[in-house]
């Protein structure tokens, strides 16, 4: 779960720590969930024992059949970036000026009214991770002349105007969009009756290696979920106080959701260690991938627990949370609504355990994550899982050509949700709200 909660946070000891990477940790079940800290960087401090704390996870949803015979439902509406004000971008009158350099604007690019030049400059800078240096102290006035002279001040002005880096699609996201468009065109082309001379279509098949990998992923997920059952009683219970607005009730709700988030993060770490190829990466790349994919995997797991009838999400056994419960815990509506919309859209796909496990693996092995060193190897690993998912979906959804691109586009939607999550965590920091050490470390919230 996400942690930009507005209720006061119980005191957390900064000295207690749990090393999620240590396989032979001692028992520390007596420690409270919120007091554990995940040491994600190479540090000289000695981590304390983790014990059962590193074995926690959310309740497993009812397992679905590995070989479903249910045909996928029609295409659902994709999640789109949500702003505080709903509705389409204002219509252009033709005389608008670029918010960065004052040139003639061509439209709204990356959340800002800007010209084609500043649009392209911002995109190139973000994709390349460019670092510019101003030779005039960083205070150049920006206009159509200076935009060509000082790139640092131009990039700063882009950000000050409101351009959002998360709106820039990576090469992989562009490739996924192109793939979806091609799949749609192929589906339309093949919707006509086939000619008599057309050769029979050859469906892809799962190789023995792919089948073994999928079986291992499903077994690993089920094992991680089973480990969480004995730890569910340690989560601070949802308050049933007569006064739901009392300080004590707000603190309980905050602790409840933060501890659920800790449980989820630790389960993600356990599962990632079981992914073929993950432990062969450097420790630094393992940490970089986990820190930036954790919230996306948490949201995927959340969508598995969505109940369309009651529009609620079940985390603990026999306890469901609706939108109002999320709000009572301190989450803001700008994030609550996208969570439920994404969960509803995922539920309509009716994915089984194998498809969820492959999607999670693809999300974790994203080479464009910050601070990833061996990007080529991460891309190779991700490609292995993408190919396995494509073959699996083609076999189990032979009459739905759009199922595979639909599933991959959900990962693009997750990037949007992840950016909203980052904004909320940053807002929490500005409000001087303290997260438990594990969540502060995984989301880079440093005091």
Curated annotation (Swiss-Prot):
Region entry Transactivation AF-1, spans: 1-96
CDD domains referenced in this protein's UniProt entry, alphabetically: NR_DBD_LXR (cd07160), NR_LBD_LXR (cd06954)
PTMs per UniProt: Ubiquitinated by UBR5, leading to its degradation: UBR5 specifically recognizes and binds ligand-bound NR1H3 when it is not associated with coactivators (NCOAs). In presence of NCOAs, the UBR5-degron is not accessible, preventing its ubiquitination and degradation.
Gene3D superfamilies (alphabetical): Erythroid Transcription Factor GATA-1, subunit A (3.30.50.10), Retinoid X Receptor (1.10.565.10)
Positions of the DNA-binding region: 95-170
Subcellular location: Nucleus; Cytoplasm
Keyword Cytoplasm in annotation: yes
Positions of NR C4-type zinc fingers: 98-118, 134-158
Keyword terms, alphabetized: Activator, Cytoplasm, DNA-binding, Metal-binding, Nucleus, Receptor, Transcription, Transcription regulation, Ubl conjugation, Zinc, Zinc-finger
Domain of life, source organism: Eukaryota
Gene Ontology terms describing biological process: apoptotic cell clearance; cell differentiation; cellular response to lipopolysaccharide; cholesterol homeostasis; hormone-mediated signaling pathway; intracellular receptor signaling pathway; mRNA transcription by RNA polymerase II; negative regulation of cholesterol storage
One term of GO molecular function: sterol response element binding
Claim: Nucleus is one of the keywords in the record: yes
GO cellular component assignments: chromatin; cytoplasm; cytosol; nucleoplasm; nucleus; receptor complex; RNA polymerase II transcription regulator complex
General function of this protein: Nuclear receptor that exhibits a ligand-dependent transcriptional activation activity. Interaction with retinoic acid receptor (RXR) shifts RXR from its role as a silent DNA-binding partner to an active ligand-binding subunit in mediating retinoid responses through target genes defined by LXRES. LXRES are DR4-type response elements characterized by direct repeats of two similar hexanuclotide half-sites spaced by four nucleotides. Plays an important role in the regulation of cholesterol homeostasis, regulating cholesterol uptake through MYLIP-dependent ubiquitination of LDLR, VLDLR and LRP8.
Name of the protein this chain belongs to: Oxysterols receptor LXR-alpha
Protein's organism: Bos taurus (Bovine)
Lineage: Eukaryota, Metazoa, Chordata, Craniata, Vertebrata
